[in-house]
């Protein structure tokens, strides 16, 4: 899989610069590049590999809304691509690259604050359709437009998973932001629960989504474990609403996995 991305990157680096191609052809090439960039970036996050799709002269703004665009039939598709592309650019630069060099994601507390602000700015740039939702609205949308549901949940999962990694990052000068990690982890894993509840058959086969949820549960569990070691930590976990909710997230994830494997919850 990794070699595929290297080859795809080499191929696209050669062919994306086509000054005499039609606008439609250029858009097709941009769409292919965008797909490679997204797959490469978000898989390198999960697999802790160095990113390979890092050199390009193509920007998010190059994706057009004109009639010649292959996504022009549905503006929501173009909005989803732009949002995913913007997020991928930020993740590649701030998470994938430091990890590949064995560097901390955040070297100072000020750096971490700026990085969180950068992620929130990207999130604010997402169209309302991908941000302003609840379980009831998605349940209704799943019956009328499941494509938008998939886009919403995939984008939500991707965003909050990477924000969780930023909050959970630590270095000699920067501790883990416990509450920030649990908040982002909850939002990320909730997207997985929603996908499973609304589109169960699809949720079972999306490896990337399932693996992200596993890593989110693991991160939440690690935070709870470390908190329990501190003085008064167990009482905090039992009484603080944020920690109680995080424990419930772990329980729901384990129950979900048991159902997928056909194992009774009582074994837990």
Q: How does the language model describe each region?
A:
Residues 1-57, 70-121, 139-226, 236-244, ...:
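Extended, leucine-rich alpha-helical cores of fungal transcription factors
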Residues 65-67:
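Short linear/disordered segments characteristic of secreted peptide precursors
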Residues 129-142:
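Long, charged, glycine-rich C-terminal linkers/tails
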Residues 248-258:
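TPR/TPR-like (Sel1-like) alpha-helical repeat modules
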């Amino acid at each position: 899989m990794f070699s595929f991305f290297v080859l795809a990157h080499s191929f696209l680096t050669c062919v994306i610069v086509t000054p005499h191609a039609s606008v439609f052809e250029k858009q097709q090439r941009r769409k292919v590049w965008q797909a490679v960039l997204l797959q490469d970036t978000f898989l390198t996050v999960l697999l802790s590999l160095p990113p390979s799709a890092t050199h390009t002269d193509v920007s998010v703004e190059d994706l057009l809304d004109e009639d010649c665009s292959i996504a022009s039939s549905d503006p929501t598709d173009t909005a989803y691509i732009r949002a995913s592309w913007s997020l991928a650019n930020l993740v590649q630069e701030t998470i994938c690259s430091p990890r590949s060099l064995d560097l901390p994601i955040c070297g100072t507390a000020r750096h971490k604050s700026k990085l969180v602000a950068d992620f929130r700015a990207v999130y604010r740039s997402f169209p309302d359709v991908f941000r302003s939702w609840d379980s009831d609205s998605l349940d209704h949308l799943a019956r009328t437009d499941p494509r938008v549901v998939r886009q919403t949940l995939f984008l939500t999962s991707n965003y909050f998973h990477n924000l969780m990694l930023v909050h959970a990052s630590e270095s000699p000068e920067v501790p883990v932001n416990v509450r920030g990690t649990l908040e982002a982890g909850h939002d990320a894993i909730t997207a997985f629960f929603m996908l499973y509840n609304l589109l169960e058959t699809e949720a079972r086969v999306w490896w990337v989504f399932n693996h992200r949820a596993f890593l989110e549960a693991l991160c939440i569990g690690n935070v709870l474990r470390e908190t329990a070691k501190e003085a008064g930590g167990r009482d905090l976990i039992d009484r603080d609403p944020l920690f109680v909710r995080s424990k419930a997230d772990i329980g729901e994830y384990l129950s979900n996995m048991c159902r997928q494997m056909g194992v009774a919850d009582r074994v837990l």
